[in-house]
Amino acid sequence: MPSSDPIEILLKHDRWATRQILEKCVPLTPEQFNQKFEIGPGSLHAATTHLVSAQRTWCDTLAGRPVRPHLDKEGKNRTPAEIMALQDEVSSEFFALVSAHPPDQTVTRERGGKTHTFTRGTVFAHVLVHGAHHRAQCINMLRRLGVTPLPPSSVVEWSFMGDK
């Protein structure tokens, strides 16, 4: 039976929805995957790399370790399959880190020379909303490239497809 825990549902959905985007990118040519659009990070490559990189950064914060360099700042042109492999690793770690501690526990992160304190629940909510925001941009880019059908992305669609 599928989980009824909203945190587990949202974590599983986030992983699944990002994978749906990346799977639709696999058959694209490198030119299509890197095509510039006036939305978000600017291309499917940039947006999906940013999504994984941001979640990895928040994993570092939740784990209490130094933040690793952003993947989207490396200038490496990854394939959709390479980004999918990174996403599998990062989303599994995020799931474990969110599940391991209470949401009211705090974590700190330095950014722009300032130290910020967040609850783990705030980080969880931010990462998932951030992911949904950029996935919507990716769906727009896929639509503009003529990809059909567009990938499913809602929690209900995820539920219909079997709680993966």
Task: Identify the residue ranges that each predicted region occupies.
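Short, charged low-complexity linear motifs
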Residues: 1-2, 44
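Residue-level preference for long, well-ordered alpha-helices that form the structural scaffold
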Residues: 3, 7-10, 79, 83
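Helix-adjacent hinge/juxtasegments
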Residues: 64-104
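A short coil-to-beta-strand element that immediately follows conserved catalytic motifs
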Residues: 101-108, 149-152
